């Protein structure tokens, strides 16, 4: 059996991955998210953007995968599993998932904003947020930026192509922790449904996908995903 998993922020929130508004110090709450997650914001103030992502990099590195991540990884023992994620953390990989396609980039990959060369040097620890931090400089003179898809930027071609292929060949698609409003990723379940593929939504709250999904499970990822593969035949009767 081939299983395609589309995951969003909900699954990582259970591990304590912070959102923009989760800064307990309130240091970042006064900034528009667009200013920290766009090419325009980067060009205006690369030190501020780098400080924001350096802090998030540190925070995400210090949380652990949850039962939802581990359940998806365990499915590999019984099925061919492809993970398509809108998340920029590495929790699927750390849980043991093999094929993970990051549609929005990764907090753990960096590149030169000018020449595109990957940056692999170690980053400084940042247990406390700082408003502005000087980004590293590439040999070409360009600044190093996170390899994240910012507002207005296209999705990376290879992960998107792999996501479409995995969706097109899946026997079942599990959509977990996503709001189903961020396109083009939100269109993948529709692609699966158009092929006659069963789409199982796992989300504590209703989403725009809920009405068309084959099954909607109103539970969190860590509640619903362990044992879900074994329950599929009964659920899909």
From Swiss-Prot:
Which residues are substrate-binding? 53, 56
- The EC number(s) this enzyme carries: 2.3.1.286
| Thermal dependence | Optimum temperature is 25 degrees Celsius.
CC cofactor note: Binds 1 zinc ion per subunit.
Q: Which CDD domains match?
A: SIRT5_Af1_CobB
Which SUPFAM superfamilies does the annotation name?
A: DHS-like NAD/FAD-binding domain (SSF52467)
Q: Which reaction does it catalyse?
A: N(6)-acetyl-L-lysyl-[protein] + NAD(+) + H2O = 2''-O-acetyl-ADP-D-ribose + nicotinamide + L-lysyl-[protein]; N(6)-succinyl-L-lysyl-[protein] + NAD(+) + H2O = 2''-O-succinyl-ADP-D-ribose + nicotinamide + L-lysyl-[protein]
**Activity sensitivity to pH:** Optimum pH is 9.0.
**Main location (coarse class):** cytoplasm
Can you summarize the PTM annotation of this record?
Auto-ADP-ribosylated.
Sites where the protein binds NAD(+): 8-28, 86-89, 177-179, 203-205, 221
List ligand-binding residues for Zn(2+).
112, 115, 138, 140
One GO biological-process annotation of the entry reads:
DNA repair
InterPro entries the record matches: DHS-like_NAD/FAD-binding_dom, NAD-dep_sirtuin_deacylases, Sirtuin, Sirtuin_cat_small_dom_sf, Sirtuin_class_III, Ssirtuin_cat_dom
Family statement: Belongs to the sirtuin family. Class III subfamily.
The cross-references to NCBIfam families, in alphabetical order and at most eight, read: PRK00481.1-3 (NF001753)
HAMAP family (alphabetical)? Sirtuin_ClassIII
Show the domain comment. 2 residues (Tyr-53 and Arg-56) present in a large hydrophobic pocket are probably involved in substrate specificity. They are important for desuccinylation activity, but dispensable for deacetylation activity.
Q: What is this protein called?
A: NAD-dependent protein deacylase
Lineage from the top down? Bacteria, Bacillati, Actinomycetota, Actinomycetes, Mycobacteriales
- Gene name of the encoded protein: cobB
